Amino acid sequence: MFLIDSHCHLDRLNYNLPLENIEDVLKKSYQNHVKNFLTVSTCISNFYNIKKLFKKYNTIFYSCGVHPLNCKKELNLFHTIENLSNEIKKLSCIKDVIALGETGLDYYYSSDTKKIQQDFFREHIRVAIKLKKPIIVHSRNASEDTIKILQEENAEKCKGVLHSFTGDYNTACKLLDLGFYISCSGIITFKNSLELCKTIRKIPLNRLLIETDSPYLSPAPYRGKGNQPAYLFYIAEYLSILKEIDIHALGHITTSNFRTLFNI
């Protein structure tokens, strides 16, 4: 079986615990059939850091972009969106950088930066279209504006994935209409995710990805503890039950979906 963690933050795992280093993390992942990883950047300095940390590992892919909660800080550093956009363009052409992001909108933690977030989100989409690379979208308490901007910026030209999806079926359908994929995280294993699971059951298998978002959102039975890519197996297992499909078949389909979207 071959599983791909389509969204993780390998640099943020807790490497201070006994026997916890990147080699141990990868070994545990391989033992759980997780064999490729997309480690996602959240700002420019973070991108440089993850590329430096993991450059010798050929199973790790990268994205380059600015998380919506980091937009204000990055604008202060780069002064203009144009300067930042040029930096993202440059870095996104580096080997093994297969996507832009994570970008998007987060109104849960920061509603006073809506305009900056929206401007950055639009610019990521425009760059992605120029570079012919997909985008990784973060959306929290902002479904309506997220869809609106994706539609207005013709994001079907670059496509992408809505990571750690928690939306309703109507939102899912609009994303699918744009050619986007929907990624399931450990949230689907939570007891209070019944409505989400009903939605996931309706989404075509050929448009689903799986992710840990580690070190966040640990799935059951590890909820409340630090997450890691090895736990993707439990997300895949739960999703296979939801979709009433053998887990090996699910692994094959989600791996194929990942390779199709990210052109690898």
UniProtKB/Swiss-Prot annotation:
Domain of life: Bacteria
Residues that hold a divalent metal cation 1 according to the record: H7, H9, E102, D213
GO cellular component, one term: cytosol
GO molecular function, one term: DNA nuclease activity
Keyword Transcription regulation: no
Record keywords, A-Z: Hydrolase, Metal-binding
Top-rank EC class of the record's enzyme: hydrolase
Cofactor: a divalent metal cation
InterPro entries cross-referenced by the UniProt entry: DNase_TatD-rel_CS, Metal_Hydrolase, TatD-like, TatD/YcfH-like
Cofactor note: Binds 2 divalent metal cations per subunit.
SUPFAM superfamilies reported in the protein's UniProt record: Metallo-dependent hydrolases
Membrane spanning stretches: none
Residues annotated for a divalent metal cation 2 binding in this entry: E102, H138, H163
Pfam short name (any one): TatD_DNase
Record-listed E.C. numbers: 3.1.-.-
Family matches, as PANTHER family: D-AMINOACYL-TRNA DEACYLASE
Family under the similarity heading: Belongs to the metallo-dependent hydrolases superfamily. TatD-type hydrolase family.
Name of the protein in question: Uncharacterized metal-dependent hydrolase BU355
Organism: Buchnera aphidicola subsp. Acyrthosiphon pisum (strain APS)
